[in-house]
Amino acid sequence: MAFTSWCIPLDKLNKKLPLGEITLFGVLGAITFALQVAMSGLPNIEPVSLLVLVYAVVFGRKCLYPIYVFVVMEILFFGIQMWNINYLYVWALLALAAWFLRDMKHPLAWAVLAAAFGLLFGLLCAPVYLFTGGLGYAVSWWISGIPFDLMHCGGNFVMVLLLFAPLRKLVENLYARMRTGK
């Protein structure tokens, strides 16, 4: 039942998104993009994984709005690239995993999830290269990226261990205040 409720297309909910949420999700997507660009000098150490986890846990399926605002901003800023195709699904996969595990309380568990995602990032992106260059290209692309996946893993682990719990609490509180008007 839980999987079914996640998969209901947003346009089938027959609910209009309130203006406050439209604004909030646009700003969160832009913040995600700005932070990723600000940290782009660090190889594969980025705040996107952390923020996707927080958005998924706090907003449920509505987390797709800020995620895809971020993806569209990436495309507009950097142009259409092969990795944009990966971004169309990898962040949603992380959000889905976070949503299923949203009741986890221990920060270490969230850090392990983020680290595993960072470690598997290249593997998750490899299918695009399988279709564009064949099996040999996809495997060589994935293997050559393992050092970057290790950095992604470590960066995600530390960032999520330190920041997930306070960010989750902050976003939950601010979102509740926004929805109640207090």
Language-model segment annotations:
Residues 1-54:
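Hydrophobic transmembrane alpha-helices
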Residues 25, 29, 71-75, 145:
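Helical-face signature of the major facilitator-like transporter fold
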Residues 33-46, 69-101, 133:
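Interfacial aromatic-anchored transmembrane helix boundaries in multi-pass membrane proteins
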Residues 64-75, 109-119:
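Central hydrophobic cores of alpha-helical transmembrane segments
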Residues 29, 56-61, 117-125:
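Small-residue-rich segments of transmembrane alpha-helices in multi-pass membrane proteins
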Residues 48-64, 96-102:
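Generic transmembrane alpha-helix motif of multi-pass integral membrane proteins
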Residues 18-21, 61-65, 104-109, 137-138:
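Membrane-helix interface segments
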Residues 82-90, 100-182:
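Membrane-embedded alpha-helical hairpins and interfacial helices in multi-pass inner-membrane proteins
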